Amino acid sequence: MVLAKDLKSGMTFLNGEKLLRVMEASHHKPGKGNTIMRMKLKDVRSGSTFDDTYRPEDKFEQAVIETVTAQYLYSMDGIANFMNNETYEQYEIPVEQVKDELLYVLENTDVKIQFYGTEVIGIQLPTTVVLEVTETQPSIKGATVTGSGKPATMETGLVVNVPDFVEAGTKLEINTQTGEYLKRA
């Protein structure tokens, strides 16, 4: 069992039959009354995100999540296909369940597949990925790194705000947690 006050971002727990992942957690002390825990949660099975509050002493069962390294193969007919790097077993995950993560993944990229028991509940991305810009506005002569930036569409469909000097065909390193441009690759 884990107390609500001990739940941190990234942890997964059971609330009744719901398998929930903590996206953000903070203590809140109102002017009157007791401290409460405000959390942004994601229902792992449905993919829905919502806000909830708990008392710090509320108890939950912590979910044991196992991970397996697998390679992303392809997506077809609403199913993303992955292959275990050690056993060559293939896993099928509904695209709807991992659509946000797939914006950072090219075919043949290694990811970690997360399991709760035998149920696939999601994928964990590497911290950074290298993607190629396929479309962006033309560069402005004399633009500097300190400019406000412009939107660029990556080869996976991800849209990232990039500095003005970036052109189509440039490979960029992208942070998968924040979706931000880090540097040229």
UniProtKB/Swiss-Prot annotation:
| Keywords, in A-Z order | Cytoplasm, Elongation factor, Protein biosynthesis
Please cite one Gene Ontology biological process associated with this protein.
peptide biosynthetic process
Function field: Involved in peptide bond synthesis. Stimulates efficient translation and peptide-bond synthesis on native or reconstituted 70S ribosomes in vitro. Probably functions indirectly by altering the affinity of the ribosome for aminoacyl-tRNA, thus increasing their reactivity as acceptors for peptidyl transferase.
Q: Does the keyword Protein biosynthesis apply?
A: yes
InterPro entries in the cross-refs:
Elong-fact-P_C, NA-bd_OB-fold, Rib_uL2_dom2, Transl_elong_fac_P/YeiP, Transl_elong_KOW-like, Transl_elong_P/YeiP_cen, Transl_elong_P/YeiP_CS, Transl_elongation_fac_P
What domain of life? Bacteria
Name the protein family. Belongs to the elongation factor P family.
Tell me the NCBIfam families matching this sequence: efp (TIGR00038), PRK00529.1 (NF001810)
**Gene behind this protein:** efp
Task: Extract the Pfam families matched here.
Answer: EFP (PF01132), EFP_N (PF08207), Elong-fact-P_C (PF09285)
From which source organism is this entry?
Answer: Lactococcus lactis subsp. lactis (strain IL1403) (Streptococcus lactis)
Q: In which pathway does it act?
A: Protein biosynthesis; polypeptide chain elongation
Molecular function (GO) terms listed?
A: translation elongation factor activity
What name does the UniProt record give this protein? Elongation factor P
Residue ranges spanning the membrane: these are none
What Gene Ontology cellular component terms go with this record?
A: cytoplasm
Subcellular location field:
Cytoplasm
